[in-house]
Amino acid sequence: MTQVTIKNEDGIWGIHISGHAENPYPETQGNLLCASVSILAYTLMQTIRDLEEDGGLKRYSEVCKDGEVQVIAEPEYWSESQLEAKIEVIKTGYELLERQFPGMIRVGGEMKNKTV
């Protein structure tokens, strides 16, 4: 099971992706899901790095290893909506995968004290 958690607490985004695609047909659906989860994670990290290079983040950290990705990002005031838009697009991708591969991926999270 792959777990995707996306949270926003007081304007600081936390994204955690963990696990592997487990299913009875690993040579087909498992590989497709795994590749899809990975490319969304890599895309997320790169688009946030691009925002960081443009001076749009107060803080950014990432961990990427086998079976786990963790990203923490705190935007500058002027880039809050840009960061949120990038994360929402990636979240939509994960939600589509959750519908396509029920029981193999779970997407969750919460937003606390979010300012827009």
Residue map of PLM features:
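N-terminal intrinsically disordered, cationic/polar leader segments
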Residues: 1-32, 46-116
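Alpha-helical support elements that line or immediately flank enzyme active sites
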Residues: 39, 43-47
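Gly/Ser/Thr-rich active-site loops/lids in small-molecule metabolic enzymes
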Residues: 33-39
